[in-house]
Structures are given as C-alpha cells and as structure tokens.
Swiss-Prot record:
Pfam families: UPF0181. Belongs to the UPF0181 family. Residues 73-85 have a biased composition (Acidic residues). Residues 50-85 are annotated as: Disordered. The lineage of its organism: Bacteria, Pseudomonadati, Pseudomonadota, Gammaproteobacteria, Enterobacterales. It comes from Yersinia pestis. Transmembrane segments: none annotated. It comes from the Bacteria. Residues 55-72 have a biased composition (Basic and acidic residues). This is UPF0181 protein YPO1774/y2534/YP_1619. InterPro entries: UPF0181.
Amino acid sequence: MLAGMPSLSHEEQQEAVERIHKFMSEGMSSGEAIALVAAEIRERHQNDPQAMAIFEDHDFDEHTESDYRRDDEPDADDIEDPYEG
C-alpha cells in the first residue's frame, strides 16, 4: 500500500507526475509507471526518517468484505447496469 512513502515537496510531486506521464507516453501502463516511480522514490528516501509506514498490507488481512460496507448495501453483481451489454 503506502508503506514507507516519504512526504514529498510540491516540486518532487510534480517531478514524479512528469516521470509517470513520460513512461505512459512511451507505452507503459499507468499502474506500471506509478509503481516504478514509487519504487524509485522509496529507494531515494530509504534512510529518510520522515518515510514512515502509513499502511501495511497485513493491516487489512484480518478484515472481510462485510467490514467495509453496510449490511443493507447490495453487492455490485446484484445491481442491474442499464449500460451493460
């Protein structure tokens, strides 16, 4: 998830966005481009004391789908989509 992502300045955020756009313009998927840039940022800030874990994947392991929705909320599969088909 967002484990170990450091706080970035506005300028660093802009540079990251530009790199993501560059990778995408070269044919890389948005997900791959984001993952690559995030890995680069994590590596660059590896010993940065501000880079602290925000979420760890195991934080979500003990929860089930019903923990994240109301009991009266219909499943997405049960909702008729007028645009489908």
